[in-house]
């Protein structure tokens, strides 16, 4: 599976953007998001 770390190029401002594995945190421009809070599951590995 895809690692749930790093940056994603899409973020709706307040929605998860990392395949439900982690929540996203938008930057001030609202264009990118940072993946945070990885779950301890195989889906995030």
UniProtKB/Swiss-Prot annotation:
It is found in: Secreted. One of its GO terms (molecular function) is toxin activity. The keyword Disulfide bond applies. It comes from the Eukaryota. The keyword Disulfide bond applies. Its main location: secreted. GO terms for cellular component: extracellular region. Expressed by the venom gland. Disulfide bonds join 4-18, 11-24, 17-35, 21-44, 26-33. Keywords: Disulfide bond, Knottin, Neurotoxin, Secreted, Toxin. Potent toxin that may paralyze and/or kill insect pests such as H.virescens (lepidoptera), S.exigua (beet armyworm) and M.sexta (tobacco hornworm). Belongs to the neurotoxin 02 (plectoxin) family. 02 (plectoxin) subfamily. The presence of a 'disulfide through disulfide knot' structurally defines this protein as a knottin. This is U1-plectoxin-Pt1d.
